[in-house]
């Protein structure tokens, strides 16, 4: 069954709502430019109150390696997601499993994948002004080609209206949603979360990676 990550968690209420709806993982954004940004202290407080078996993922953009590792330790993060221009050797220095995000403009955007040794790749829509959370989709044919050879987490403009088509097209290991289940930036919508996860979990995918 496909894995679902709800990203941009900023408060305990939304975190528990996502867990109760069936989310496999929660994402915390450690990037001050984002309207969904949290401090390590805020994230740690939420994570301490989560039930077991829920994966916690920290999103970073071009932060120093020491800051990433310190934050991961302080918050008890399970996985680190890197959304900037972090090089393969940088990723190797992270003391957690790593998901490397790539912003997809065309097929050439995936060429760096062969150089990385990471747990998974997250594919998001390319934007000249943001490293994620834009609400934009991209060419899923490109993602499908990548998913045939790699463990892929699909992101970018996903909503309850298009998630079934996305899963059937790409066959990803997991899907990642943030703005698609929000009432406002940083505040989740209960109905949207439940519907998104329900449809994602009910949609048949051939992915078993």
From Swiss-Prot:
The species this protein was found in: Pelobacter propionicus (strain DSM 2379 / NBRC 103807 / OttBd1)
Annotated CDD domains: PRAI (cd00405)
The catalysed reaction is:
N-(5-phospho-beta-D-ribosyl)anthranilate = 1-(2-carboxyphenylamino)-1-deoxy-D-ribulose 5-phosphate
Name the chain's protein.
Answer: N-(5'-phosphoribosyl)anthranilate isomerase
Name the top EC class. isomerase
Give the metabolic or biological pathway.
Amino-acid biosynthesis; L-tryptophan biosynthesis; L-tryptophan from chorismate: step 3/5
Tell me which family the UniProt entry assigns to this protein: Belongs to the TrpF family.
Encoded by which gene? trpF
Q: Which domain of life is it from?
A: Bacteria
Presence of the UniProt keyword Electron transport in the record: no
Q: List the Gene Ontology MF annotations in alphabetical order.
A: phosphoribosylanthranilate isomerase activity
**What keywords are annotated for this sequence in UniProt?**
Amino-acid biosynthesis, Aromatic amino acid biosynthesis, Isomerase, Tryptophan biosynthesis
Q: Which residues form a coiled coil?
A: none
Q: Which SUPFAM superfamilies match?
A: Ribulose-phoshate binding barrel
GO BP terms: namely: L-tryptophan biosynthetic process
The intrachain disulfides are: none
> What EC number(s) has UniProt assigned to this enzyme?
5.3.1.24
